[in-house]
Amino acid sequence: MKLTCVLIIAVLFLTACQLTTGETYSRGEQKDHALRSTDKNSKLTRQCSPNGGSCSRHYHCCSLWCNKDSGVCVATSYP
């Protein structure tokens, strides 16, 4: 019985904490956090190599076609 009461109180407390945190972020205080997240993601993105650029894998090329024998990105041509 005591354990059940403790668990119920803990769940209510955690729910209240989440609700107050959600209200804080909805007032616009999350703006700086979102900018930091965007800056971090932009640093992680990689640039692709244009046609004629060097490559070792197909995903290094903007066209997604890499001639692995010569190590050069090639243009795609569909009939």
Curated annotation (Swiss-Prot):
UniProt key word Cell membrane: no
InterPro entries assigned to the protein according to its UniProt record, in alphabetical order: Conotoxin (IPR004214), Conotoxin_omega-typ_CS (IPR012321)
Protein keywords: Disulfide bond, Knottin, Neurotoxin, Pyrrolidone carboxylic acid, Secreted, Signal, Toxin
Residue span(s) of the pro-peptide: 23-46
Signal peptide: 1-22
Cellular compartments annotated: Secreted
Pfam families found in the cross-reference section: Conotoxin
Domain of life, source organism: Eukaryota
Family (UniProt): Belongs to the conotoxin O1 superfamily.
Protein name: Conotoxin ArMKLT2-031
Organism the protein comes from: Conus arenatus (Sand-dusted cone)
